[in-house]
Amino acid sequence: MPGLYCPTSWTPLPLTDSCVRAYAKGPCLSLRARLTYHNPQPQPVEGVFVYPLAEAEVVSGFEAEAAGRRVSFQLHSRRRSQAACCRALGPGLGTSTPRRCAQGHLVLNLAQARSTLVLPTGLVAAAGTMTVTLCSSRELPSRPDGVMHVALPTVFTPLAQPNLPGSPRSPGLCDDSPTSCFGVGSPEEERPTWEQPTATPDVFSGPARCPAPYTFSFEMLVTGPCLLAGLESPSHALRADALPHASSAATIRVTLAEGHQCDRALEILLHPSEPHQPHLMLETGSLSSAEYEAQVRARHDFQRLQQRDSGGERQVWFLQRRFHKDILLNPVLVLNFCPDLSSKPGHLNAATRELLFLLDGSGAGHKDAIVLAVKSLPAQTLVNLAIFGTLVQPLFPESRPCSDDTVQLICESIETLQTVNGPPDMLAVLDWALGQPQHRAYPRQMFLITAASPTAATTHQALEFMRWHRGAARCFSFALAPACRQLLHDLSVLSRGQAYFLRPGERLQPKLVQALRKALEPALSDISVDWFVPDAVEALLTPREIPALYPGDQLLGYCSLFRVDGFRSHALGGQEPGWQSLAGSVFPSPEEVLSATSPGTEPTHTTEPLGTGTVSAELSSPWAVGDSEQSMEALTDPVMDPGPNPSSDTAIWRRIFQSSYIREQYVLTHCSASPEPGPGSTCSSESPGSQGPGSPSGSRPLDPPSQQGCRSLAWVEPAGSRSCPLPVPPPSPFKVGAMSAEVLGRRQRAALAGRSLSSPSGRANPVPGRARHPSLDAIPDGLGPEPGQQLGQGLDDSGNLLSPAPLDWDMLMEPSFLFKPVPSSAESAPPAECLPPQAPRCHVVIRALCGEQPMCWEVGVGLEELWGPGDGSQPESLPMREAAWDQALHRLTAASVVQDNEQLALRGRAETRAEQGRVRRSWLRAIQTSKVSSAPSCFTCPVAVDATTREVLPGALQVWSSDPAELSGMSASQDQLAAAPLSTAVHSKGHQGGCSAGAWDLDLNDNSKSALGEPISPTGDHHGLPHQPPASSRLSLGRHRRLCSSNKGQTHENSNDGSNHDYLPLVRLQEAPGSFRLDEPFCAAVCIPQERLCRASPFAAHRASLSPTSASSPWAFLSPGIGQGDSATASCSQSPSSGSEGPGQVDSGRGSDTEASEGMERQDSSDLRGRTWATAVALAWLEHRCAAAFGEWELTASKADCWLRAQHLPDGLDLTALKAAARGLFLLLRHWDQNLQLHLLCYSPSNV
C-alpha cells in the first residue's frame, strides 16, 4: 500500500490529484507523474513517500514541494555505520512498516530496499498540500504472443471508495466494447468491491488505497521500431489518436475515453505488428560525439596522460575506463526480441532439460509423487535427486540421462528413503544445485519440495544467493508447511519459476505434474548475441549473462556506443586506413596465435612464407600489449578511477584480432554477448574496437587492452565468417606494392566466396568458394552439421527466422556490389568510380538452441543519426533530443550495468577472497554507475537533498538499508556439502562396509550398491552431455529383478494416499522411451489375463500363439475356471515366432548367419508387436479406469503416445486401428465380466 505516509503513526495522506504522462518506446516505458496530497490533520506532519519499484526500474527524478520548499534525492554510498545499525535490528523479514533503530533512522531490509523507494519529503503544513513529481523508467513485460503489458503503479491510481449511488458508465467508442476494438468485455461488471484498509497498513505490498475519490488525467505516447497493430485495455475505455501535424502513424497518442472511476488500476495491452521479430532501437546521448570528445580532452587527468603518452591506444584505454560513467552522454542501442515459443505437438517428448529434485528429508511421505515425476520425464532429459537435511546427499555426482537404469536407481532409492531429522539447510542445497556444471542445450529446472521453517537470517541469505544466480535455473517450489511459504514464493519469483502450496491432506502429484509440464515448455537456451559495429566505435555490452528464454520472456540487450576515432592514431601516409587490424572479435581464427609483450616494448613480428599462411594472418597487423602486474599497479588507481590496465592479467578478457574487409570509411567490429565465459577469460564488459597501425607483412595479432565495465565477452564459437552482411563499397586506391598478386587474388576470392577471410576455428572450409550465409557459418560446437552440410532445413522449420531480406550472393555480381580486381604493380590502375559511401550501420546476430536445434535471427539498424547522411562524418547538429523523457533507454542500460557489477562483486566475495582487486573494481563500478545514472544498487542508498542547492538536508529523516553481507553460513554449508558424499553409500567409492545413517540407507544387492557407489569422475567440459556410464555388470539390472521390484511398496504407498488411484503400478512399468512390455507384470498391473490380451490383439501372431485348446473353446475366455484351471492367467504357451514356425522346422540350407539374422528380425518384430499392443492397452486402461486422475498421469500418457506415433507398425497396421482395438478390448472385457457367450457378440478383433 504505497503512497505518502506520516511516519509517526504510518497513516496515509489522501491523494487529491494524479496526473500521469507515459512514453512507451518499444519494450521500455517512461513515466512522469505529478501527485498532490492533502494533510487533513490540524498540525504539520513529517512526510515519507513510499514508491514500489518494478524489476530493473530506475527512478531518475524525484521532487517533493510543499510551502515553497523542494526536496529531491541523491544516491550516496552506504556507510559502515549503517551496517552496524541494521545488524542490531536483525533481518526483519515480513514487517509491514519500516523499523526504527536506536538513533531514529528508518531501517529497511535488503529485500525491501530493492523493491521499494522510501524517501523523506519534509514537513507538510496543517491542512496544506504537497506535490510529488516523479520520473522513472522500466521494462515492459511481454506475454507469449508478444503483446506488451503496461500497468501503472497503484500509487498513481489508488483504489478509492466509490460514490454511492454511482452513475452508470457511458457507452464507449465502439459498439461492441468500451475498452478496445478487440472485443474485450466492459470492465463495469468486473469492478472490485471496496475493502476498508486495516489499522496497520502494509506499506511495502498490496494496492494503494485512498479514502476519497480523486481526479486523474492520463496521456501516453506509443512508438517503437515497428508499427502498432492495436491496443486494448481490460480496465478502461481508451482513445487512440495520431499526434498533431504527424506525417505518419509511427507515434500514437493514447488517452482515456471516459473518466477514471478510482475503482481499478489502469492496464493497457500493446499489440506490435511484428511481435516475434528482433528489433533495434537507437537513443542519442546528451552530448554529440564532438562535444563528448571536447569534454574528455578538457579533463585534467586526460591532459596529464597525454603529456606522459600521446599514443592513441593509451587515450582509447582512458576512455574505456570511463565507459560505465559516461553512459548517459553517448548513444545507446537496445535489442528487443520476444521469440515465438508456441508449443508444437510432441514437443514434450523432445524437450531437453536438466531436472534436479531437491527433497526435504521430512518429505519422505511423498515418495509416490517423486516416482511419478521421474517416470514422466522424457528420455532426452537429465535428472538427479538430492535429499537435504543438515547435509546435502545427492544420488549421483552429476546429472545423468534419464535412461531405464537411472530411473530404476532413483525409484529404488526413493523406496528405501527414511525420514531425516534435523533442520534442513536451504542455503546448502541451493549452493549445491546452482553449483552443478551446466550442460549445453539443457536448461536447468529445480524442484524444491520442503516443509522447512527457516529463520529470518536463513531466508535473507537464501534469497540473496538466488539473486546472484537468478539466470542459472528456474525454481519450482512446493511448500508442505505454511512456515516456508514466503521464502519459496520469493525464490520462485526471482528464478522465474512458480510456487505451489499444499493444504493439509492435499496430494502432491497434480501440482508436481503441473510444474513438470511448465518446466518442459519450449525454451531457447545457450543464447549468444553478436554485435557488428563500425570500427570507429567501442561498445559497452550488457547484460553479461543471458538466461534461457521461455514463453513470455523477452531478450533485452543494451549496447552503449562510444565513438573513439578522434582519439586513435591514424594510419601513416601511404598506408590505406583499411589495413588497420580489427580488434573487435573475441573469436580467434585458426592461424592466429597469442603473443604478449610487456608495456613499452615493440610487438613481435611473425611472418610466414607466402602461400603457407591464411589471408587472415596476412591481413592482420600487430600492436603491442603488455601483460605485467607491475604496470597495472603503477598505472591504475582503482580508488579514483577504477578500471583494468591493458596489461592486467586478472581483469582482461582475451580479445583476438579478426581480419575484415578493406573498406573506405570503416571496418566492422565484432562484439559478442553470451552467457558462456571462454577459456582464460575472467570478466569484462565491452567489445574491443581499438586498432593499431596496419601492416601488410602478415604479422601475428597480439592482445589488445581490455576494457572495464559490466559485460563479459565470451568465446562462444569461432567466427571466421562473421563479417557484417552489408553491401561493401569498392576499396579505395592503396599502395599495391605492399601485397603480392597471389595474396590479392586470394583476398578477392575469399571476399567473393564467403565474406570472410578465415575459417571457423578447428576446421577448414569444406568447399572453398562456396557461398555461406553469415548466420549459418558459425554454429555452436558440437551442435552444427558436419562440414559440407547446411542448416537450411532446420531453419526453414523454425519459420523463416533469418532476416526478412538477407543479402543475396548473386547481388555481389552487380556493379554496385562487385569487388573489383586490384591490378599488379606493373599495371596501371583504372580510375576508381566515384560512388557515395555507405552509411554506417549496426548489425546484430542472435544465435540460440531450441532443444538441440540451432536457431538464428538477424537485425540491423542505420547509424545515420550519429554520423550524418552524407560522407560518414559527424553532422553539425544532432536532431532534437527527447529530453522530456529523461533518456529511458540510457537509464535501463545503466541499471543493467549496475546489476552486472553487483553480481561480479557479490559472487567474487562469496566464492573466493583471493581476487580482492577484481571484486573491488566491480564494487566501485556499481557505485559509480549508480550515482551517475540514479540506477538503484545494493551498495548505495537514497539521501534527501535540497532540490536547489543539491546539499543534504540537515536533520532530515534518514532511510538506511541492511548490508548485502557475506553469507555467514556459506562456508559451513560448503564444508558440510563436501563431507556429505563421503559419509553416504552413494558417493563412497568402493565402500562395502555398510551404509552410514543417512538418507540413502539402501537395501539393495551387491550389484546395486556397486552401481551407486561408483561416482562419475568430473570432467573439464561443463557444457557437454555427461558421459553415460559404461555398460557393465555393475550397471546391468536384470530384467527379472526390474520386473519383480516394480511393485515393491505398492500397498504401503496406496495406503498413504488414502485414495484409490491405482495407476502407479502401471506407471512403474513404463520404460524410459515411453513404451510398455507385454509380460506378466504388465498383465498384473492392468488386471487382465495375458491370454485375453493376446486374443484381443490386432496382430495375428499374438492370436496364433495361443494354445489350440484355449483357442477352440470360447468358454476358456468367458469362464477361466471351467475346464481350464488357472490356464487363463498363464503366459502364452509359445512365443509368437515359435508358434508360427511349427515343431517340425528343418534346416533351410541358406546358412547359419542368414538364418540367425532372420531370426533376430523376427524376434525384433515380435517384440515391437508386443510393445505397441501393450502401450496401446496401457493408454486405453488409463482412460477407462483412472480418468479422474488425468492431471496426474497425462505426461506419462503423452510420452507413451509420442512413442507410438514414432513407430512403424508391422503387419501393415496403422495407429488408428491399434488404438481402436485397445478401446474395443475394454468393451469386450465388460462382456466377459458379465459372463456372456462370445459367439453372441458382434465383435471380432480381426475386423477392427
UniProtKB/Swiss-Prot annotation:
Domain VIT: start-end pairs: 1-138
- Cited InterPro entries: VIT, VWA_domain-containing, VWF_A, vWFA_dom_sf
Species name for this entry?
A: Mus musculus (Mouse)
Gene encoding the protein: Vwa5b2
Q: Which residues form the VWFA domain?
A: 354-527
Pfam families per the record? VIT_2, VWA_3
Could you tell me where the Low complexity compositional bias lies?
684-701, 751-764, 780-789, 1127-1145
Q: Where is this region: Disordered?
A: 184-204, 590-650, 672-710, 751-789, 1008-1037, 1126-1168
Cite the record's Basic and acidic residues compositional bias ranges. Answer: 1159-1168
The name under which this protein is listed is: von Willebrand factor A domain-containing protein 5B2
Q: Where is the composition biased (Polar residues)?
A: 595-619
